[in-house]
Regions:
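Blade-level signature of beta-propeller repeat domains, shared across WD40, Kelch, NHL, RCC1
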Residues: 199-224
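Beta-propeller domain segments
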Residues: 6-185, 216
Length: 224
């Protein structure tokens, strides 16, 4: 499974390839390692950052950067689905254009209105969005760190800035999700480092962190 972002400003793009089903820009794809062929799983993505495949529940969890705000957490279709989901970029976003408002760019805003709803315009809503942005990064999933019984427990990293730690930057977000894909609880664990990457090591029951600020490796583990 691979993510591909929108490699240029949507509103300034001549081709709008994010919206085209025959283009891989702004998509999440599944690659067959034997045949080298791929299929599109979802579209309408701006800048996917984190990706985790839950093989037990056959679900794809992903994160992506919004523009100025509007970072997203999405639960994607299973790789077996024949339905291509559309998350709406650049028609819908909970972020804003950089420099908005700017009267010189009114025509560009019309091309990419960044509507503050996905569902109303025929797209899928993120299960969580962040405004202001937390500079979202990797996502991992494990239910082994806590005795609380939830269907899904995810851990989401954030880059960002020291001045915005109180808003969730430079932290790990522990999010509890029920069977109906409703968020029931959200804990923020300040790390005071830009968290670039994370990986869950099942054999150790630990999450290994790549901390970009100091260029070091961190370990997140349960103390229960």
């Amino acid at each position: 499974i691979m993510t591909i972002g929108d490699w240029e400003y949507y509103e300034k793009s001549k081709n709008k390839d994010v919206e085209k089903i025959n283009k891989i820009v702004g998509k999440i794809i599944l690659i067959n390692q034997d045949t080298k062929k791929f299929k599109i799983l979802s579209m309408g993505h701006r800048n996917p950052q984190g990706l985790f495949y839950d093989s037990i529940n056959n679900l794809i969890f992903s994160t992506e950067h919004g523009p100025q705000g509007g970072d997203e957490i999405n639960i994607n279709t299973s790789p077996d689905s024949k339905i291509i989901k559309n998350y709406g970029w650049g028609k819908s976003s909970y972020g804003e254009h950089y420099g908005y408002p700017d009267n010189k760019n009114l025509d560009l805003y019309a091309i990419a209105p960044l509507n503050k709803s996905h569902k109303e315009y025929g797209f899928l809503e993120p299960i969580k969005y962040f405004t202001p942005s937390i500079a979202i990064s990797q996502i991992v999933k494990t239910e082994k760190f806590t005795n609380e019984k939830y269907k899904h427990i995810i851990y989401v990293g954030a880059l960002g800035y020291p001045s915005q730690i109180s808003e969730g930057d430079m932290s790990i977000h522990q999010i509890f999700i029920d069977k109906k894909i409703n968020i029931k609880k959200h804990n923020i664990i300040p790390i005071n480092e830009r968290i670039r990457d994370m990986i869950y090591v099942k054999e150790l029951n630990k999450i290994i962190l790549y901390l970009e600020t100091s260029g070091s490796i961190g370990i997140l583990q349960s103390i229960n």
